[in-house]
Each structure stands twice: as structure tokens, then as C-alpha cells.
Amino acid sequence: MAKVVVTGRDEEDGNRIVKDMTDKGQEAIFVLADVTKKAEIQAVVDKALEAYGQIDILYNGAGIHDAYDNAVELEEDLYDKLMAINVKAPYLASKAVIPHFIKQGRGVIINVGSQATQMAGPGGSAYVTSKHAVLGFTKQLAFDFGSQGIKVNILSPGFIETPMTDGIDDERLNRIPAKRAGKPEEIAALAVFLASDDSNYMHGSNVFMDGGWVLGRK
């Protein structure tokens, strides 16, 4: 069974997630951190090593959306915030754990993308740019470190039933070939596969779970 370190800036939410896991007999801790700050990311890594002795899997799941603004309408502050959370945070976390993976001779990094890794439209200028950047970063990590036993892939969900996608109307869902939003459990199952030995020959892959959204809109 996995031992999990949950991190983020929302202490209440983080503790809720950990309690939900521990109530089910799983082992987990929460470490409060701003994932855009190098020192705080390093503190999370240190805490994980102190608690569990090693790190095997890094899941870079932090992310925010924009207001579907084009480049002219987009405020610079929002652009900077998106780039910090969606792009800089995965870089900082990966930079912190990869030396440990190299020493172990193995490790897994799963970055979170979206349909916006492949197409325009699922967000505005900042969001689409950020997710294209995450895709490029994932590919380069896989290229640079795959020979050292480090597997890096990107999981790209579509509309999933989460607070981030609340308020999606039926008209938009009906344009998805599957005609529904995805479930968190479906994303979790895919993440487990990408973390497992069953996907060991996958390096730098962009794996979609989006109900067919990137195939085209009906």
C-alpha cells in the first residue's frame, strides 16, 4: 500500500484528504507548502524522506484555470500566477526529487495536463500556454532521465467531476463524444497504472482521459 504525502496551501483541505485516507486504513501525512516556492518544496521532500525513508512517485497535480481570456484581455498578474502554479511548480518539485530517484535507480513522475496540451480552446491564452509548457517539460524530462530508470508521463484529463469544473452545462457535456464528465475514480485508476510497472515502457507519453474531447466537438 502506498504511503502518501499530500501538500498544498490549503491546510483544511489537505488535512481533510489525509483524514479520508487514514480512515480507510491508508498511511498519509499533510505538509503545508506553497508549491511555487523552492524552499517550501524542498521542505516537503525532506519531510517525506524523514517520514518514509524514500520517494518513489511524484504526482504534480496542482493547477489553476484562467477566465478564457485572450492575450489582449489577459491580465499580467493572472498570467504570472498561472505560470507559477501550472509550470514552475512541477519544475521545482521534479528538480527536488530527481536526485533521489537517480540514487535509487528508479522513480516515477506524473504531470497533469489537460486537453489544452493538444488544442486551443479548453482555456484562455494563459492556461493553454501553461499546459503546452507542461507537455514539453514532461517530454524533456523523459528524454533526459529515462535512461536512469526514471519514468515521466503526462496525464491529461478532460472535464472531471471536481470543484474546478463545477457549473459545466449540459450543452457543453453533450459536445463530448462520451456525453458526460469523467469521475475522479477514473483518473485515479489511470494514475495508478502510470505509476505501476505495467507502464514501464511508456516514457514521455501524453495520456488522455477526456471522453473523446480532443477528437473533435459534436
Predicted regions, residues:
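Active-site helix of classical SDR
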Residues: 94, 130, 138
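Short, small/polar-rich loop/turn modules that mediate ligand/substrate recognition or access, typified
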Residues: 53, 146, 151, 202-204
